[in-house]
Structures are given as C-alpha cells and as structure tokens.
Regions:
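Conserved lysine of the Walker
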Residues: 72
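Helix-rich C-terminal or lid/interface subdomains of diverse kinases
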Residues: 2-54
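Conserved phosphate-donor/acceptor-positioning beta-strand/loop module used by diverse small-molecule
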Residues: 156-173
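Hydrophobic anchor at the beta1->P-loop junction of P-loop NTPases
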Residues: 62-64, 90
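Pre-Walker A (Motif I) flank of P-loop NTPase domains
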Residues: 57-62, 131-133
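P-loop (Walker A) phosphate-binding loop of NTP-binding proteins
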Residues: 67
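Conserved substrate/cofactor phosphate-moiety recognition/catalytic segment
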Residues: 80-133
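Hydrophobic positions on the alpha1 helix immediately C-terminal to the Walker A/P-loop
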Residues: 75, 79
Length: 173
C-alpha cells in the first residue's frame, strides 16, 4: 500500500482510458484476423470494463470491528479484492508516520495516538469516497465514538455503512 489515496480521484479515468486502448488494439487485431475469436473476446471484455467503469458509482463503507487477532485483516483483504474496494488498515496507517523503531513503538498506542489514527483513517475514507470508491476500514473500532465518526461520514453522504464484527475464542486471540 503506497498511501497515495489522493490519486484515487484520477484512477477510474486512467483505467477507462487503458481499457479503451486495449479494446482498440483487440479490434484492430480482429480486423486483420477476422477469425481470431480471442481478439473478439478481448474486445468485448475491455470495452465492457470501460462501460462498467463509466456507470455511476455506488460507494459504501464497511467497518471491520473486533479484537486484534480475530481475523479482520485476512477477511478484509480478501473482501476488498473480491468487491473492488479500497482497504484502509489501522495497522498500516498507525506505522506510516513513525519510524519502525522499538523505542517509539509504545507511542503508537497512547490514547492520543489511537484517536489521531482514527481521525487519519476517517480523512482517508473521505478521500476514497470522494473518488467514488467503496472503502473497507480494518481497525478494532472498540470505542463507540470511533465507529460513530464513520457512521456519520456515511450518513452525511447518504451511502450505506456496514459493520462486520469479528469474534474469536480466547485461545485464538
């Protein structure tokens, strides 16, 4: 994860452009080789992708909630890939502004640092939603106020918000 969420606003445009270029290449190939079924299939796939990506987007928010070790990260990674959502990870964003130095590791878990991390996640979720991309936020969300902030964000945009709660037996945690 590069952390370049601001680039999401242009991503759809460039994916559509690239799909149309690939569709054109496939069309030219089929023109030169009319019996090339693979070229026809490639054209259909790329052009279809471009059409789907120009349709109005329906973003939403999924909050992955639960204790550390309950499976949130594994599930959210798989779900994000499956549904084409942007996944925001509290673990990744928590470590991003600080050196990966043992002396500073405990500073990442103060109440202030945790609140700042949720504020950053919310800002990144706003940026992601501005780009009309669905977003999955992978964090413990143990405090009601942290969940409420994202629920308010979704409500303010009239988009759905879902909370996926993860549980695990104590020996697993």
């Amino acid at each position: 994860c590069t952390g370049d969420y601001a680039g999401l606003a242009a991503l759809r445009l460039y994916v559509v452009y690239r799909a149309l270029v690939r569709a054109l290449v496939a069309a030219l190939k089929q023109r030169d080789h009319p019996r090339d079924d693979a070229a026809a299939a490639a054209f259909d796939a790329y052009f279809g992708l471009a059409v789907r990506l120009t349709a109005p987007a329906s973003p939403f928010v999924i909050l992955c909630h639960g204790f550390s070790g309950s499976g949130k990260s594994v599930a959210s990674k798989a779900l994000a890939q499956r549904i084409g959502a942007v996944r925001l990870s509290s673990d990744i964003e928590r470590k991003r502004p600080m050196r990966d130095d043992g002396a500073f590791a405990s500073a990442r878990y103060t109440d202030e640092a945790i609140d700042n991390n949720y504020a950053r996640l919310r800002m990144l979720a706003e940026t992601t939603l501005d780009a009309l991309c669905p977003v999955i936020v992978d964090a413990t969300f143990l405090k009601r106020a942290h969940r409420a902030s994202f629920i308010e964000l979704a409500a303010g945009r009239s988009i759905p918000v879902y909370i996926a709660t993860f549980n695990a037996d104590l020996p697993v945690l």
